[in-house]
Amino acid sequence: MENMTLFYGMLAGYIIAIALLGYLGYRHTRSAEDFMIAGGNVHPFLMALAYGSTFISTSAIVGFGGAAGVYGLSLLWLTVFTILVGVFIAFVFYGRKTRELAHGLGIKTFPEMLGTYFDSSFIRRFSAGLLTVAMPIYAAAVMIGGARFIEESFHISYQLALYGFASIIIVYVFFGGLRGVIYTDAFQSIIMFFGMIIVLGLTYWQLGGVTAAHESLGAMHHLVPEGLRSLGHAGWTSMPVFGTEIWWYVVSTLVLGVGIGVLAQPQLAVRYMTVKSSREIYRAMLVGGIFILCMTGVAFTVGALSNVYFHKTSGMISLSASEIGGAGANVDKIIPLFITQAMPEWVLMLFLLTLLSAAMSTLSGQFHMISTSLAYDLNPAAGENDRQTLIWTRMGTIMGFLLTLIFAFSLPSSIIALATALFFGLCAAVFLPVYTAALYWPKVTKSGAIWSMVGSTMLYLYIVLFVHEKEAALFGICEKLFGVKTL
C-alpha cells in the first residue's frame, strides 16, 4: 500500500474504538456472571451481531472463500445451511430452550449447563477438556487467516503479523470479558457488513457485471486441472460429480460439517444466555440472518469469481495464482491475493479492517470460551469466590492465547477451511446429541449421555485419523502406524 498515512489513520481510529468499547466492557464487568454471560441483559440487536460476527470469521472469508476459489459456487450450499440451520433452527429450536435452561439452572457456561442438567461432573469436565484441546486449533485457523492477509498487504513476515494481530485481541478479552466481547463484536460486524458489500459490488464491476462475470466463470470449466477433474471437479459453476472424492469433501466436510455443526458451537450457545428473555432471541433472528447471508454469500461468490479475474489478468486460475515464490499452491492466499491485486487501495484498507474485525470478533469468543473452560469448568474451586473466579478466568484467557499461538505456528498451509470444518464436525458429533437431549428428551439418563459423548468422540477421531482421506493424510497417524494413508 502506498498511502500509508490514510491507512494508519483508519487503523488508529479502529483501535481507539475497540479500546473504548473494551474499556466500557471492563467498567461493567464486576462479577463472574458479567465476565461469562455479560450479566444476562444484552440487547437482542447486539446479541444478533455478536452471534453473527463470532460465527463468521476469517476462516469463512479467507479459508472458505479460498475453498470456493477451488471448488466453485457449490459452496453456496453452505450459505443455505448457515441461514436455515445456523440462524433459523438455531434460534427458534435451540436458542429459546437454551436460554430458559441456563437461567433456570443458574449456570454460566456450556459445559456447566450439560454437566448440571445430567448431574455429572464428568460430562462437565469432559466437555471443558475437549474444548480446551480442540478449540485452540479452530482459533489458530482464524488467527492464520488474519495474519496471512496482513502478511500479503504489508509485505512483512508471517510471524510478525501473527504476533501483532494476536496481541491486540488478547488485551480486550482479558479485561472486558463477554461484555467487552459483545460490544466490540457489534462494532466489528458493522464494518464487516459494509466492507463485504463493497467488495462484492467492485468485483462485479471489475468483471463486467453480474451476468458477464458468471457467464465467464461457467465458460472456464475446461480449465479445471486434470488432477481435480479426475477427483470429480466439474467446473466452478457446477456441483462436483456425485459420489466422487471432491463431492464427499465439499458436501460432508465443508457443507454439512459446518452447516450442522454450528448448532452445537459452545461459543455461540453462550450468546443465547446473554439476553434477558426468550422473546429477545426471536427479535434477534432477522438481524442475524441478514448478516450471515451477506458474509458467507459474498465470500463464496467472490472466491469463485476470482478465477475469472486471475484468468483475464494472468492466464491462470486462482489455485495456480496462489503459487507464490516457487511455493506450492496455498488456498488460504487466494482471497488476500485477489483483494490486493484487484481492488483499489482504499478498498484494500477497508477489507483489511473487515478481516481484522472478522478475526477479532471470532477469536475473542474463542478465547473467552477457552478461558472459562480452563479456569471455571476444569477448576474444582471455581464458583466458591466470585472475585477469585474472575481472576482465574482472566488467567485462563492467557493460557488459551498461548495454546492458540502454538497451533498457529505449527499447522500446515491451506489449513483454514479444513481446521474449521473439523472443529464444527467434532462439536456436531460429540455435543449435538446430548445438547438436543438436554433440551427436548428428559428421559435420557446420565450414563447414556456419558457414553454418547465418549463414543462419539472415539468414532469421530477414528474416522478423521484413519478413514477420511484428506484429514488422515494431514495428520499422518494412519500411515505411521499401518503404512497406508487410510484404512
Q: Where is each model-derived feature located?
A:
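Membrane-embedded helix-loop-helix hairpins and adjacent transmembrane boundary segments
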Residues: 1-487
